[in-house]
Regions:
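Catalytic alpha/beta core domains of metabolic enzymes, predominantly
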Residues: 127-131, 140-196
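Active-site beta->alpha loop and helix N-cap motifs at the rims of alpha/beta catalytic domains
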Residues: 2-146
């Protein structure tokens, strides 16, 4: 699948109320602010969005709200990764039903895949739950503890992950990043962003 995001995509925060509940109303303000500042899309419920601190229901509500208030021509890319494969599949299916532009998922962070084939198996089961959406593997080894070589992952994904369109590359390994960009004649969209 060749879909490509264009322009600046922001890894959005999740707004909270003083009582730590999610403030769904503020999402519209964020979306308008991003659009007014030339941002072309948002990666929601990722690490900046505190996904692993949220319940599955909260993440679904955030996805629904973002899709409802997203400006025209604004891409909503939803992180659906979870330590529970069943929860990740439910998040993926809900993102597709809500009308998100695409989904992404990082590896499990507790019972971790130990090779590229196992990681592809995990991602394929999530991506199959939203087969109409572009899927990005969220490579963030500093947070997940999974540092499987991404070129090995891309090779293993051939024919097994049909809606894989790219990598959200969150690692300081610039050599690996460049190899990803060049892999299969630039077939995959490789989004780069890392906090320092």
């Amino acid at each position: 699948m060749k879909n490509e995001l264009n322009g600046l995509i922001v890894p959005s925060i999740t707004p909270f109320n003083a009582d730590y509940s999610v403030n769904l109303d503020r999402i519209e303000t964020l979306a308008a602010f991003f659009k007014d500042n030339g941002i072309k899309g948002a990666f929601i419920c990722g690490t900046s969005g505190e996904s692993l601190s949220l319940t599955t229901e909260e993440r679904m509500a955030i996805t629904t709200r973002w899709v409802e208030v997203a400006p025209e021509d604004f891409s909503v890319l939803v992180h659906v990764g979870h330590n529970s494969l069943v929860a990740a599949q439910a998040l993926a299916a809900q993102a597709q039903k809500a009308g998100a532009w695409g989904i992404g998922a990082h590896s499990p962070t507790f019972f971790k895949p130990n090779n590229a084939d196992a990681l592809v198996d995990y991602c394929a089961q999530i991506a199959a739950s939203a087969p109409k959406l572009p899927f990005y593997y969220y490579h963030i080894p500093g947070a997940t503890g999974v540092s499987i070589n991404i070129i090995d992952f891309l090779r293993a994904a051939r024919g097994r992950l049909p809606n894989l369109c790219g990598i959200k590359f969150t690692s300081p390994n610039m050599m690996e990043y460049q190899l990803c960009r060049e892999f299969d004649d630039g077939k995959y969209d490789v989004l780069f962003g890392i906090d320092s």
